[in-house]
From Swiss-Prot:
Domain of life: Bacteria
Keyword field: Ribonucleoprotein, Ribosomal protein, RNA-binding, rRNA-binding
Every KH type-2 domain range: 39-107
SUPFAM superfamilies registered for this protein in UniProt: Prokaryotic type KH domain (KH-domain type II) (SSF54814), Ribosomal protein S3 C-terminal domain (SSF54821)
Recorded GO MF terms: mRNA binding; rRNA binding; structural constituent of ribosome
GO process terms (BP): translation
Subunit composition and interactions: Part of the 30S ribosomal subunit. Forms a tight complex with proteins S10 and S14.
NCBIfam families: rpsC_bact
One CC-aspect GO term: cytosolic small ribosomal subunit
Name the record gives this protein: Small ribosomal subunit protein uS3
Pfam families associated with the record: KH_2, Ribosomal_S3_C
């Protein structure tokens, strides 16, 4: 039985970039990695209402740069930048080095798999039927220009005694094509019956278009 690899991880270094960019020796590596995980967990909890999709961390010699990708930058920045200044101080104290925090707005949150997954999870927590939530997310994503989307939900759906997996797909989602720009997101819906996992794959198109060579004319071949 085949298992699906993480679409982002398998494309790292090809068409996807790492979420943490730094170099460390064997002693510092686990410290930096653990620190990155804690920083992301802290920011996700702090900005849970800001629709944060991903957090990029760049470590330099004596400081760090953090980029927050969010669909609601106003909540992150706050009035006159007060919230982001407080956030910068907290993260700097957390990491032990000066930190520069920047915010990038996600123009089309319907094309972001992580935000779509979190949106479906929030609807499931509000006791909305899972099929209705899935179809609504699929329609919104295809409307803004996606070439394909697949949504999978797993758990005690609608309070059933036996957990099961249901999925819905429209368009193309070529998981085996490395040049395919596939965004992947995962979220959990905490319901009274248990936790329901939500996975989303969004196909945005191919990064490298195939090269079409023009056929040689007869005169050029003879020459």
């Amino acid at each position: 039985m085949g298992q699906k690899v993480n679409p982002t991880g398998i494309r790292l270094g090809y068409i996807k970039d790492w979420s943490s960019r730094w170099f460390a020796d064997s002693k510092s590596y686990p410290v930096f990695l653990n620190n990155d995980l804690k920083v992301r967990e802290f920011l996700k909890q702090k900005l849970k209402h800001a629709s944060v999709s991903r957090i990029q961390i760049n470590r330099l010699a004596n400081n760090a740069q953090i980029t927050i990708h969010t669909a609601r930058p106003g909540i992150v920045i706050g009035k006159r930048g007060e919230d982001i200044d407080a956030l910068r101080r907290d993260v700097s104290r957390f990491m032990g080095v000066p930190v520069q925090v920047s915010v990038e707005e996600i123009r089309k949150p319907e094309l972001d798999a992580q935000l779509v997954a979190e949106g479906v999870a929030q609807q499931l927590e509000k006791r909305i039927m899972f099929r209705r939530a899935m179809k609504r997310a699929v329609q919104n994503t295809l409307r803004v220009g996606a070439e394909g989307i697949k949504i999978s939900v797993a758990g005690r759906l609608n309070g059933a005694e036996i957990a099961r997996t249901e999925w819905y797909r429209e368009g193309r989602v070529p998981l085996h094509t490395f040049r395919a720009d596939i965004d992947y997101g995962f979220a959990e819906a905490v319901t009274t019956y248990g936790v329901i996992g939500v996975k989303v794959w969004i196909f945005k198109g191919e990064v490298f278009e195939p090269v079409h060579t023009e056929p040689k004319t007869r005169s050029a071949v003879e020459a």
